């Protein structure tokens, strides 16, 4: 049986924690930030842990993990 391919877009955008959870950057932070207040910008800095429902779908695109 041939090897399964990993989705290359997924391996670029997500990281896996030591416990197996997925982390990703927050969307909506590229431009037009003047309309958002400082609290929104501060809270969406860095990465966030994905929900279990989303992580299950994303892990199906990573047959061998990251």
Swiss-Prot record:
GO terms for molecular function: structural constituent of ribosome. InterPro entries: Ribosomal_bL35 (IPR001706), Ribosomal_bL35-like (IPR021137), Ribosomal_bL35_CS (IPR018265), Ribosomal_bL35_sf (IPR037229). GO terms for cellular component: cytosolic large ribosomal subunit. GO terms for biological process: translation. Gene3D superfamilies: 4.10.410.60. Belongs to the bacterial ribosomal protein bL35 family. PANTHER family: 54S RIBOSOMAL PROTEIN BL35M (PTHR33343), LARGE RIBOSOMAL SUBUNIT PROTEIN BL35M (PTHR33343:SF1). This is Large ribosomal subunit protein bL35. It comes from Phenylobacterium zucineum (strain HLK1). The gene is rpmI.
